[in-house]
Amino acid sequence: MTCRNYHNKYIYLFEKYMYLGGEVFMKKIKEANAIAAIDIGSNYLRMSIAEINTDEVIKILEDVIKPINIGKDTFTSKKISIQTMHQTCYHLKNFTQLIRDYRVKSYKAISTSGIREAENKQYILEQIRLRTGLNVECINATQERFFMIKAINYNSNLNSLKQVLVVNITSGAVEVSIYEKGRLKFIEQSKIGSLRLRETLGELESKTLDFPAIMEQFIENKLYSIKSTIENLNFECLVGLGGELKTIWKIIRAKSNSNNQKHFLKDGNFIKREDFMQLYKHIRRMTNDQIRFTYGVSYKVAELLLPSILIFHCFLKITKSKNIQIPMTSLRKGILYDLAEDLLDINKKKESQNYIISSVWYIAEKYRINKKHAAFVEKIALSIFDQTKKLHKLGEKERLYLQVASILHDVGIFVDACNHCIQSYNIICNQNIIGFSDKDLQLTANIARYHSEETPKQSHKDYYILCDQDKMTVSILSAILKLAEALDISHLEKIKELKLTSDKDLLYFNLNSEEDIVLEEWNFMRNSDFFEEVLGVKPMI
């Protein structure tokens, strides 16, 4: 059920109350395991309220969409205006009323590039918190991608396809990623989103008779490096996200007056290449007003339709794809699934982590690390973590930090073999690890930095700026990583099995190896003091 305005919402609730009978209806609301996802985007404020059950089924109860000028403000003046801030808070306050009406158990509110790139970002987020009570997380592009991939994965099976190209057009950027049987093989982003493109080149529109041609030239210039990577690859599927694709699909479907065939994506559809090209030729010659009146769309949609079509047209030319697959999903759906995984411990959570790790191995391969050594250190580090849970009492999130740091601890060798630890820190901090926030990257980079002889110190600025809890997390995980690294100093993977036993203040590492491990034992003892200092037990072989 879609709520077009807030008054309709209360009419609907009253009618439902009368239809079911008061007690029955109130019981249904009370029993509903409701969650909510709020997306504060560049063009729209969106909220989805859903009901989840133990069968991993999410049923949308309410979708609310309100237009906003956040992106227009940010991409033109780099600041969000006071007027836009007031409008945003007004609508979000109404969102919170719906959250109370549905007795939502858990919610997640996020903002994307419109707020993320605004110079007054912190002021806006604080005003939202004070005026509405909503705690909004300003996510980065990789987190945004993680939620979208999660949403797609619940509605399809990308793992079964050999090679998939995913093109995600947001208001601020275009992100291109390649997946091979579910593993990320390539990712790159270009800041030519539909709204940013329109705002960046807007002043040229009155100076040329062929503004679409100017935009196309600009797009091709920005996508040059991406083109060289993907133009010779054969994709089983081109998946399109965002960029008013649903509007484009509806226009084409209405024009053909028949439903397109269903594809492998549940509730998904596709646009045939020839149909898209025909629409491209028509819209390319139209003004925003002509688009609005011809296709019955709002002005906001009309002004984004042309740049979106031009961007997708560029990718169709590059890939020779026969169609564009359109998962009928959204960023909000991905957030809802993420909330559901946390609440119900859904099996797909492990699958989501696999996407993160595949993106990490993509980075590792790019920096030409020793994959066997990295995989061995990862295995040993996670084994130590799992067998010492009673000592450190850390959770799955921290385990993921350790896993990523273990894989990437040597990436700095690519830049400087002599000072590779600090270079590993610098490289990791500047990576796009899918699903990782800026804070996640900072913690992981610190853990990787201290994998060798160096230990965390207050004089290290990047360690000093962490809060006390995060400092402790870094120290514990780097202490574990040090020992894992020490046990493969030869890079020969000599240790076949590792079992830990404890006796008072001693932690025994029982190693099974068929080779001489004198070097490993020596290096282990050199790195054991820091482990004892942090965790209070002395590791012994």
Provide a role label for each language-model segment.
Residues R4-F25:
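Short, Lys/Arg-enriched N-terminal segments with co-localized hydrophobic residues
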Residues I29-K59:
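N-terminal basic/disordered segments at the start of proteins
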Residues E31, G41-Y44, D101-V104, L130, ...:
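Short flexible coil/turn linkers enriched for glycine and charged/polar residues
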Residues N33-I35, I49-E51, D73-L98, T112-N120, ...:
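Helical "lid/coupling" subdomains associated with nucleotide-phosphate turnover
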Residues E56-L61, R183-K185:
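Beta-strand initiation motifs
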Residues Y107-A109:
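Conserved beta-strand/loop subsegment of P-loop NTPase cores
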Residues I152, L165-S177:
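A generic, well-ordered mixed alpha/beta core segment in the N-terminal half of proteins
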Residues I517-K538:
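Short, non-transmembrane amphipathic alpha-helical segments
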